[in-house]
Amino acid sequence: VLVTPGKVPDSYILDSEALLREKGWIYLKGSKKEMREGTDGFTYRYAEGPVTFPDALNRASRTVVTGEGGSSPSRFKHVVKFKPTKGQVGRLGLTDAKCDEVRSKLNLGKTQWLRRLTPVELERLNGFPDNHTELATDGRRAFFMGNALVCGVVSRIANEL
């Protein structure tokens, strides 16, 4: 399903600031037990368990949802670890102290980093041919894949009917 690292646009590679900030990737993917306040002033205890982060490549994938597109941190977007190219490391500064902090928190190797899935990878994950949605923007492509039925499942149902 995954494309080679050199084919991953820089915009899909996560930056350390987005990972470490107060409501960033690490916070959103993690477990929470906290007090929250509703718009009417009512306070309540909010709790949720962690989401595997980064996504495990040796297990079945989570469902692609319509909010998969865009670069903003989200609990629901797929994030995978990968080995960036030397060019990506240099352009994005993936060797600074904040990147080392992220690697330490997430048990990443020295040459590993994190990225979101590209539109082609989302298409592959859902069983569509590469570039099935290429005429749309990347955000719309992700939305389409989040709104799609997995082709293999539909094909099997059709064959049984």
Across the structure, where does each feature detected by a protein language model lie?
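C-terminal target-recognition/interaction regions appended to catalytic cores
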Residues: 1-161
